Amino acid sequence: MQYARAAVMVEQNRVETWEVPIFDPAPGGALVRVVLGGVCGSDVHIVSGEAGAMPFPIILGHEGIGRIEKLGTGVTTDYAGVPVKQGDMVYWAPIALCHRCHSCTVLDETPWDNSTFFEHAQKPNWGSYADFACLPNGMAFYRLPDHAQPEALAALGCALPTVLRGYDRCGPVGLDDTVVVQGAGPVGLAAVLVAAASGAKDIIAIDHSPIRLDMARSLGATETISLADTTPEERQRIVQERFGKRGASLVVEAAGALPAFPEGVNLTGNHGRYVILGLWGAIGTQPISPRDLTIKNMSIAGATFPKPKHYYQAMQLAARLQDRYPLADLITQRFSIDEASKALELVKAGALIKPVIDSTL
């Protein structure tokens, strides 16, 4: 059996480089040589233990783009019916459908009752902090369009599918929408991008990082607010002055910080919508007044675990917008598999917009 490298989380806050087996794909699956593995804020929560107990040891990375090395028996197309062959570039959704549960077949919702998110590091594995990913039968993957830039798609990793999932949950962005995005990391930047591409009237991005706020403007934000230079009251006043009496018709929480939640409720205007995307790994509570929700007639939706269709939509959208917006520029640094811990530390510190693991390094 042949072996390859992988960044393995062996216990909480401990990541090592291992030599792991390269498995042949199972019938219906695919073996992929990883080209880019996105480093996500969720990975930081996983390593720290905030995301809950994990079945150590696990190969990290749930954002992956790679080239097909070998197809399992019976595989001739991707999950959209597009023919595939060895060497084609693909992008995969990181949870395999079971097709045998209430969530899958009745609700058509994710996560599924029998969802498998991690596997033991020495077993066939789809983690993207590795030289190879072995995609099981049922794990949706899609062939990149010939003109697609892998970096443009990897830059938005699971953030763009998450945003598309969120807008599915709270309703699409319209031409008359006034949007506030809390946080300008990858999820927030993806929220700005989709809102701008959908024709939103006005988009305000809020963040502490001048670099991230500049990137938000390049992706379509019409105004930015520095979190470091303003109080919550000042931010609310700026939003009211910009949007008028109506206020924000849509607020997107993409900050991953608990205090963002009550502030987002305050920023949401009458009959507005508030979608929570970034608080997946933030454990705790925040006080809000239920009366505010009633008086404003507002809606709140949470969203996580995008469906396979959201990964497909994200791939198509990134390919369509890659020449209009500087998507590939979101990738601010590349790391080798051996440097995975360093990449995670820098993401935790907020020092990078979007790092990736590059297995060629």
From Swiss-Prot:
Binding site for Zn(2+) 2: 98, 101, 104
Entry-linked InterPro entries: ADH-like_C, ADH-like_N, ADH_Zn_CS, GroES-like_sf, NAD(P)-bd_dom_sf, PKS_ER, Zn_alcohol_dh
Positions annotated to bind Zn(2+) 1: 40, 62, 170
Record note on cofactor: Binds 2 Zn(2+) ions per subunit.
GO biological process: (+)-camphor catabolic process
Cofactor(s) of this protein: Zn(2+)
CDD domains documented for this protein: MDR_TM0436_like (cd08231)
Gene3D superfamilies in the record: Medium-chain alcohol dehydrogenases, catalytic domain (3.90.180.10), NAD(P)-binding Rossmann-like Domain (3.40.50.720)
GO molecular function: 5-exo-hydroxycamphor dehydrogenase activity; zinc ion binding
Gene induction: By camphor.
Known pathway: Terpene metabolism; (R)-camphor degradation
Keyword terms, alphabetized: Metal-binding, NAD, Oxidoreductase, Zinc
Stated family: Belongs to the zinc-containing alcohol dehydrogenase family.
PANTHER family in the cross-refs: ENOYL REDUCTASE (ER) DOMAIN-CONTAINING PROTEIN, L-THREONINE 3-DEHYDROGENASE
Name the UniProt record assigns to this protein: 5-exo-hydroxycamphor dehydrogenase
Source organism of the structure: Pseudomonas putida (Arthrobacter siderocapsulatus)
